[in-house]
A protein has these predicted regions:
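Glycine-rich, proline-tolerant flexible connector loops at the mouths of alpha/beta enzymes
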Residues: 113-114, 139-164, 269, 274
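Conserved anion-binding
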Residues: 147, 206-274
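Alpha/beta enzyme core
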Residues: 124-142, 193-194, 250
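N-terminal amphipathic alpha-helix/helix-capping segment at the start of soluble metabolic enzymes
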Residues: 76-107
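Active-site-adjacent beta->alpha loops and helix N-cap segments on the catalytic face
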Residues: 152-164, 186, 206-219, 279
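Conserved, mostly hydrophobic/aromatic
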Residues: 106, 136, 199, 265
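Alpha-helix-loop-beta-strand connector modules within alpha/beta enzyme cores
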Residues: 153-179, 218-222, 285-296
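Active-site mouth loops of central-metabolism enzymes
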Residues: 110-125, 235-239
């Protein structure tokens, strides 16, 4: 008999754990089940990681596994810091710090690893954005350049042209705030001038000479600042290295005039980290959230 790969055994075990938890809560309402059994979220996250790393599994990850994780993070991160309330001129609002929220991802790209080419037409992008908002997304993140491994890097001009074909329509139709996923300050300035609500910089203000931070400060919008690096080599402890990165990021942000209450941090799961390093960061996430009392975004 052929030996079953270890990763598949772990996958089956995690599926069994989730099944037992769901069965034990069969008498409860669905929302109560999620609140009462947050441990299922961690098993669900392991399932997601394994699912995408097993080449012989062709079916997409079932949606149920994306539901548990945000509920768990509300407990794990201990969201006791003051609530951040954001309100924009167009009437849109966002409250961070009280409960965990879900960000919807809209990639208007032809080559993103998860959904490249699915939403890069006006009709499909509008439909998907509205569906995510209806399903409970508190904000929508729009990206015009893929950041998957091996992606083709765009110039700021190319990214801006692709984004601005759709952004005005999305802003006009959206019922929730829209953030822009870009590390090009030129693209971000165009998007913010068109009415975008938030910055999402996957290089944490460290891609350029401070221009992205200056643009963010000029428009007075919230900014999601992510940890990233070009390789997976860390000298010493990974959390210590990430803290050094965030120290630089915060120094750049505050020096440029970005208000502290508008800063959101992201540990960059899947960026500049191996699978094992990702799991270590998740296991030690509270070390970061305690060191930096800001709202935190997790990409899962």
């Amino acid at each position: 008999m052929e030996e079953m790969p270890c990763s598949r055994v772990v996958l089956l075990v995690q599926l069994m754990i989730i099944s037992l938890i769901i069965n034990s809560a069969a008498s409860e309402s669905y929302s109560s089940m999620i609140r009462s059994h947050r441990k299922a979220a961690y098993a669900a996250f392991f399932v997601a990681l394994l699912w995408y790393n097993l080449e012989d599994i062709q079916q997409p990850l079932p949606l149920i596994f994306t539901i548990f994780f945000p509920a768990a993070m509300q407990k794990e991160i201990h969201m006791t810091r003051p609530v951040r309330n954001y309100k924009w001129k167009d009437g849109k609002m966002l409250s961070l710090g009280d409960v965990s929220l879900v960000m919807g991802i809209l990639n208007v790209t032809p080559d993103s690893f998860s959904d490249g080419g699915l939403w890069n037409t006006k009709e499909h992008a509008m439909s998907h954005m509205k569906d995510m908002a209806a399903d409970g997304a508190a904000l929508i993140d729009v990206g015009a350049e893929s950041t998957r491994p091996g992606h083709t890097e765009l110039t700021a001009e190319e990214e801006t042209a692709r984004l601005m074909q759709l952004l005005p329509l999305l802003l006009d139709a959206s019922s929730v705030p829209i953030s822009i996923d870009s590390y090009h300050y030129e693209t971000m300035e165009k998007a913010l001038s068109a009415g975008a609500h938030m910055v999402n910089d996957v290089w944490g203000f460290q891609y350029d000479d401070g221009s992205m931070a200056a643009v963010t400060a000029a428009y007075g919008v919230p900014a999601i600042l992510m940890h990233n690096q070009n390789d997976t080599v860390y000298e010493g402890d990974i959390i210590s290295s990430m803290k050094s990165f965030f120290d630089r990021t915060l120094s750049i942000a505050l020096a440029a005039g970005v208000k502290e209450e508008r800063i959101i941090l992201d540990p960059g799961i899947g960026f500049g980290k191996t699978g094992e390093q990702n799991m270590e960061v998740l296991a030690r996430l509270e070390e970061l959230t305690q060191a930096y009392p800001y709202p935190w975004l997790l990409g899962v």
